[in-house]
From Swiss-Prot:
GO CC annotation, single: plasma membrane
Gene Ontology biological process: cell division; cell wall organization; peptidoglycan biosynthetic process; regulation of cell shape
Pathway terms, separated by semicolons: Cell wall biogenesis; peptidoglycan biosynthesis
GO molecular function, one term: phospho-N-acetylmuramoyl-pentapeptide-transferase activity
Top class in the EC scheme: transferase
Subcellular location: Cell inner membrane
Family per similarity comment: Belongs to the glycosyltransferase 4 family. MraY subfamily.
Catalysed reactions, semicolon-separated: UDP-N-acetyl-alpha-D-muramoyl-L-alanyl-gamma-D-glutamyl-meso-2,6-diaminopimeloyl-D-alanyl-D-alanine + di-trans,octa-cis-undecaprenyl phosphate = di-trans,octa-cis-undecaprenyl diphospho-N-acetyl-alpha-D-muramoyl-L-alanyl-D-glutamyl-meso-2,6-diaminopimeloyl-D-alanyl-D-alanine + UMP
Protein name in the entry: Phospho-N-acetylmuramoyl-pentapeptide-transferase
Membrane spanning residue stretches: 27-47, 71-91, 93-113, 138-158, 174-194, 205-225, 245-265, 268-288, 297-317, 343-363
Amino acid sequence: MLIWLVELADHFQFFNLFRYITFRTGAALFTSALIVFLFGPAMIASLRIRQGKGQPIRADGPQTHFKKAGTPTMGGLMILTGIVVSSLLWADLSSIYVVSTLLVTLGFGAIGFYDDYLKVTKQSEKGFSGKARLGIEFVIAAVAVFFMMQAALSAGAAGSTFGSSVTFPFFKDLMLNLGYFFVLFGGFVIVGAGNSVNLTDGLDGLAIVPVMIASAAFGLIAYLAGNAVFANYLQIHFVPGTGELAVILGAVIGAGLGFLWFNAPPAAIFMGDTGSLALGGLIGTVAVATKHEIVMIIIGGLFVIETLSVIIQVFWFKRTGHRVFLMAPIHHHFEKKGWTESQVVIRFWIIAVILAMVGLSTLKLR
């Protein structure tokens, strides 16, 4: 919204700063962090009163988790408020990529909110029906992917299939054109990303920091992919307009920092599905928009590992009646092995940093 103030640059030189994505990214980060810091305490107090018993604790979970009983959830409302308000202020709302990303973020956030609501009111781990939830998520994601695909096709040269193609790291010219099946592929990527972050959110601070790390990595990717000069130098695919996504990702980092202030152990609030689904969906949408869906598997490798641990556990238990892990997702396995919560969280943060660096290295290895 504030980018329109660039029109005043002829009279007030200061407003020329609003042209630059880097300036607006920094401003978005600061704004979202400030919003969460200022309004966080009031939101936490309100949620604690309204929820009473707070988020239900898994009966089969580690014993150390029972002391968290009564902690309110839906902290994602704080994060989403910071992200959305900051993005509306600093991002270019004429960009279909910005609009699509915010659509997915709010849509997934609403689904997560309803899921949290059911869990709190019923005091049960079972919330929204799994199949129904996945179905609605996929519809939202597919709509966003369709519009982004059309934008990429329109921006490309006549006859170009880039908008409907999947690109691969390490190979600058390798593309797989999926046609309109790209909508299904992109929808799967976004839904998978949302639910992977959701599965990771099981310990204080465990999900939010890797989300910020992935956001920083994809913020750089979005900025580079949206700049013709840098994209040509790195031999990555140029996607006009995606640079604006760096502004949204800056807002994610700022809101994440603000939330971590209250989510640091012992957590005063949990982000809940409201936050984890929305943040995962946001990152997945950026990956699709910038044509780095495969790279997301590396950068978001921690989320992939958490998801695979659940899939393996369920598959093997149904097949043999035995468990591969003491408990899934895998962060609970390590707790059962004797690791303290802080050891699990910090070691997983380290893994997230390493994976993000490996993912970014693919930009130059072509």
